[in-house]
């Protein structure tokens, strides 16, 4: 059975790559694209160009290195067309279990040294959990409870970069690229997905995006519902209260139109609102089976109107849900969300969709750990996006395989073997005196002496649930 699964997977992989190849144009790009995708699926520690050249063409590594460098860094094929083809092939596999439930917006960071890689700046890096030198990309994933797939991906170009003509020129940032905030990039992703007719889902975002009122209102204007993380100081009107109407007209000038507040009529922060809720408002809800037990926490929900600058508006905003999480044992609530899901949505459904955002975290984890999303070593705009696009293509195949391989199959399934690297191979920059290649370039090198004899071939484990 294992051998049959492996053979079938290899056959499907060949057909999958053939479809991706069909949208890249020139025939001279076919070989490099195949090899790059294969390299991303190989069991190398590093998925940058040099080690992938060594494992995909061990007898002509130097020539392969140059070929892959040109293909990933300079070739003008369309990232959007490749991602569209991947989406076309993979989404039907994901939807075999259930329709798409969510559109998940988030960003991911890549720690970097120096200042010359495109978009690198001192900014918050989620991978490190702190401010540091890094690149950040904003993505959109389509998800259901079984799987998810990134369908849009773009580097965030900090304002200092967008205004620096010299650095833009050196890294070949396209002329049309201007500074945009991360929420603005996210909105572009969402608009493009709507225009492409992608299967609709609830837009999910954390507080880094959800606190942006314009983003939330723009998502609603596109006909999408959302669940958006917010901060504890977000101000709202509790159901049954709202801003004061405009002042009575005095009979002179234009009649007043703007809503009002006064000293005794003010909105409340969601944190204060949560602390004042009665005990019966809180409910323990389970939302997903974890590795050892069901995940659960304590939640409350209330209907509110967002108060953000409504004194500059002529009408109150519509009511929406405020969802609050306050785990047992915590001194105060830990998370808050606003949601435009229908008023009759069940409590459990609201929590379930809110927590589905974990899917994009799974995407990022596996894109980085399994197919080398963060391993690109070039400095240019095009190479950064080409590498990410093919990482998503490789990941898309692995996602579709999860939906194809029967549940009774072993936890790991292998189908690609890395060829042995010639003993004469030396990575660029190594000294003639040092006759040992760097460990990360030799996919078969045992890193410690007690691991036993070196194997002739190494098989790549498939991703697993």
Language-model region placement:
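Active-site-adjacent bridging/hinge elements
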Residues: 115, 364-371
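Short, solvent-exposed helix-loop connector elements
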Residues: 214, 339, 347-354, 369-386, ...
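Hydrophobic alpha-helix feature that most strongly marks membrane-spanning transmembrane helices
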Residues: 355, 359, 368, 372, ...
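Conserved nucleotidyltransferase catalytic core and NTase-mimicking acidic/glycine-rich helix/loop elements
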Residues: 398-428
């Amino acid at each position: 059975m294992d051998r049959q699964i492996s053979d079938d997977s290899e056959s499907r992989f060949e057909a999958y790559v053939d479809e991706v190849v069909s949208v890249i144009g020139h025939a001279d790009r076919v070989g490099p694209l195949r090899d790059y995708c294969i390299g991303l699926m190989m069991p190398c520690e590093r998925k940058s160009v040099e080690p992938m050249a060594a494992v995909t063409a061990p007898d002509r590594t130097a020539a392969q290195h140059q070929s892959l460098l040109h293909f990933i860094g300079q070739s003008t094929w369309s990232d959007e067309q490749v991602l569209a083809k991947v989406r076309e092939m993979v989404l039907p596999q994901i939807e075999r279990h259930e329709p798409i439930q969510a559109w998940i917006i988030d960003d991911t960071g890549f720690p970097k040294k120096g200042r010359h890689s495109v978009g690198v700046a001192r900014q918050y890096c989620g991978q490190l959990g702190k401010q540091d030198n890094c690149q950040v990309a904003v993505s959109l994933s389509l998800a259901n409870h079984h799987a998810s797939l990134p369908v849009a991906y773009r580097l965030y170009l900090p304002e200092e970069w967008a205004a620096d003509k010299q650095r833009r020129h050196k890294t070949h940032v396209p002329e049309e690229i201007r500074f945009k905030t991360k929420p603005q990039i996210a909105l572009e992703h969402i608009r493009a997905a709507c225009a492409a007719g992608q299967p609709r889902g609830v837009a999910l975002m954390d507080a880094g995006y959800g606190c942006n009122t314009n983003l939330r209102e723009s998502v609603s204007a596109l006909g999408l519902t959302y669940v958006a993380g917010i901060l504890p100081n977000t101000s709202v009107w509790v159901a049954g209260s709202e801003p004061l109407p405009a002042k009575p007209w005095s009979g002179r000038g234009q009649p007043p139109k703007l809503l009002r507040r006064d000293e005794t009529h003010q909105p409340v922060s969601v944190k204060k609102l949560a602390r004042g809720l009665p005990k019966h408002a809180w409910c323990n809800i389970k939302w997903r089976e974890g590795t050892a037990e069901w995940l659960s926490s304590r939640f409350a929900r209330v209907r509110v109107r967002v108060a953000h600058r409504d004194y500059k508006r002529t009408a109150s905003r519509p009511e929406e849900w405020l969802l609050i999480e306050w785990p047992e044992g915590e001194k105060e609530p830990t998370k808050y969300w606003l949601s435009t899901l229908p008023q009759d949505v069940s409590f459990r459904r609201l929590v379930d969709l809110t927590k589905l955002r974990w899917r994009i975290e799974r995407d990022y984890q596996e894109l980085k750990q399994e197919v080398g999303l963060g391993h690109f070593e070039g400095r240019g705009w095009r190479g950064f996006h080409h590498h990410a696009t093919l990482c998503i293509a490789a990941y898309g195949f692995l996602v579709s395989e999860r939906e194809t391989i029967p549940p009774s199959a072993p936890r790991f399934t292998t189908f690609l073997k890395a060829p042995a690297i010639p003993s004469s191979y030396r990575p660029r920059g190594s000294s003639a005196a040092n006759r040992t290649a760097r460990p990360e370039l030799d996919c078969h090198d045992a890193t410690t002496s007690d691991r036993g004899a070196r194997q002739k071939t190494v098989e790549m484990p498939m991703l697993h649930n």
